UniProtKB/Swiss-Prot annotation:
One of its GO terms (cellular component) is plasma membrane. The lineage of its organism: Bacteria, Bacillati, Bacillota, Bacilli, Bacillales. This is Regulatory protein MsrR. The keyword RNA-binding does not apply. InterPro entries: LytR/CpsA/Psr_CW_biosynth, LytR_CpsA_psr. The gene is msrR. It is found in: Cell membrane.
Amino acid sequence: MDKETNDNEYRRQSEHRTSAPKRKKKKKIRKLPIILLIVVILLIALVVYIVHSYNSGVEYAKKHAKDVKVHQFNGPVKNDGKISILVLGADKAQGGQSRTDSIMVVQYDFINKKMKMMSVMRDIYADIPGYGKHKINSAYALGGPKLLRKTLDKNLGINPEYYAVVDFTGFEKMIDELMPEGVPINVEKDMSKNIGVSLKKGNHRLNGKELLGYARFRHDPEGDFGRVRRQQQVMQTLKKEMVNFRTVVKLPKVAGILRGYVNTNIPDSGIFQTGLSFGIRGEKDVKSLTVPIKNSYEDVNTNTDGSALQINKNTNKQAIKDFLDED
């Protein structure tokens, strides 16, 4: 009887050992639909949030901004994993004439998650197709972003796919919405002349209007070169400030606001894709280049445009190519 009892006990233990993994597998299988359901619910909630936030931004822009007419641009689509954008800071001079206060070309590499920024000095003396020689920023007033793109291509070999014209009000609104606590900037000197605000030397958190004034200041020995340097500093700081959850979750609403204050031919999908990739996964440091590069230009006085920068085109074209192609 003892032997029979031992045999029965052995069989029960064997059955328990073999059935335990099966029960665990069944539990895992039962949990799988629940997990999938939770994922689906979260995705639906995310889509609803994005749509609601975007529409909220659009409604905000409708109340505070004017209708924006998209320009013809016809930039070449390259399909190389990179997006290049001609970014223009626009103001209206007396009489309503639109002018560019800053000219930048921004390239984002989706594969390597890197951003590069190139500032083009607005006083470059350039060949403007159909208009002869003038300062390069005159191209925008004469023919909008499209003519400026053609001018950049002819003189510097730059031919971006998209454009974005940011008016000053739009810049202020976007900064205040994204970063209500202000943007940390080390103001290197007291600034006030022709910028609409008074800034004191030292470390400060600047709101949208103050940050715009800082980026526009040019009344010091550096002149326009100093302004370009500060604009690049602002872009670097904004990139670093964007890499946090509180800012990223606001991107859909900001994209909606963009539609009211930024004149651009970038589709909504492109704004979302670039913004999320840049804000979440992109490198914190943005590589920058100022055109013309050092020792490649001279100051000249022109009959039509006054003081301007006469550049060595070949030297600058090669520097631009090396900068954009560098990994």
